[in-house]
């Protein structure tokens, strides 16, 4: 077939929501369940050809997403309903497409992104939850959310996050730019909301682990600033559990005009 006869290639972006509790992370791996593998299988069924997706951020085992963004290329010409309702019909109940948008050739779910936003949900109660046990992290000591918020503000701007970086992190640099970090209480729930240009491995969970020590009055408010300055992961608290973490939004330049659905999760407004 000559070049003139090649079918056109379409580039499509999707918004994805998933409960990560039954998966070994986003990334496709041999012999274990991954969100990517389930999504690619469903897309391939609708497209009637093999589909490979590229995501904005690869979440770890047990981590959830309400605002994950992916893109893929296909020669299949389908209506939007096929990429949403049709794909959802082929997905397990804990993964769903939220929106679809045709994007130009220069769009890339990861490399076009300008910021990522995560929310970490702590169920702060003496007794553990049952219904949402895989969607929140239980912490039984009373937490002072206002104290946590004040302590976290030293993390704003460009900083070296070595103290909050996993030992096995493969990023070339520990420097990241945090645009906002807010800690708020909603009844028994404490929510840590953090947005940055990018994150080193386990950065949000490591920050939350240390903030909980401050919130429980086990460490002074100044401790977070001291950890940041020390650039030593061994001095910080243990990594917070995966189940409370959600990728809630990814920012892109306005020219792509991607949909911006409510971030959530659950009861949380934007």
From Swiss-Prot:
Swiss-Prot/TrEMBL keywords: Isomerase, tRNA processing
Region of interest (RNA binding), residue spans: 107-111
Keyword Isomerase: yes
Region of interest (Interaction with tRNA), ranges: 168-172
Catalytic reaction(s) noted: uridine(38/39/40) in tRNA = pseudouridine(38/39/40) in tRNA
PANTHER family: PSEUDOURIDYLATE SYNTHASE, TRNA PSEUDOURIDINE SYNTHASE-LIKE 1
Family: Belongs to the tRNA pseudouridine synthase TruA family.
Function summary: Formation of pseudouridine at positions 38, 39 and 40 in the anticodon stem and loop of transfer RNAs.
Subunit annotation: Homodimer.
Name assigned to this protein: tRNA pseudouridine synthase A
Native source species: Escherichia coli O1:K1 / APEC
Lineage: Bacteria, Pseudomonadati, Pseudomonadota, Gammaproteobacteria, Enterobacterales
Gene: truA
